[in-house]
């Protein structure tokens, strides 16, 4: 598929360019296909091209999906299909799929291995600041003590650092739709520096 070839070539580019080219290629490629007639199984390779076949995304600001709770993944896919969340590649990818298809896709996602955390020597100061913020704002109350998520609450451990930062900022400025408004309340008093420390901490958890 030309879109997949373009995604593959995008991985040789720097961050922002890589993401822009990959998303542009996918949108263009999907627009040229009779997508509503395409079964879920034929769409999965394109899903994995961006989100990672092994559960760990290599594409900037694109989430790793490995080990996400099936219920949470189902809700997000339903929201993309019904355009309650707007992201053109995801809106196109889920177009025409039945509820059962989306549940099947979510089940596949939930069985992918957990994403690999950032492999570096963590900055102890940033890790401690991130841990303290997570405890202060009781992130582990909903996301579980190991931040693996549960039911309708997403896994955060090992998620891409840049994606976590983007999502947290999106909740604060209301550019990211949250079906649980509690997230907007939690992040309201936080600053970009706090988001950066939280993302740094969570991305390095196994």
Predicted feature descriptions by range:
Residues 51, 81, 143, 172, ...:
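Protein kinase-like catalytic domain
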Residues 40, 55-85, 91-97, 131, ...:
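Gly/Gly-Pro-rich "capping" loops immediately C-terminal to redox-active cysteine motifs
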Residues 36-54, 117-118, 122-145, 160:
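Sequence/structural segment immediately N-terminal to covalent heme-attachment motifs in c-type
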Residues 14, 18-21:
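Positively charged n-region of N-terminal signal peptides that target proteins for export
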Residues 95-117, 162, 188-206:
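C-terminal capping alpha-helices of c-type cytochrome domains
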Residues 22-32:
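Bacterial N-terminal signal peptides
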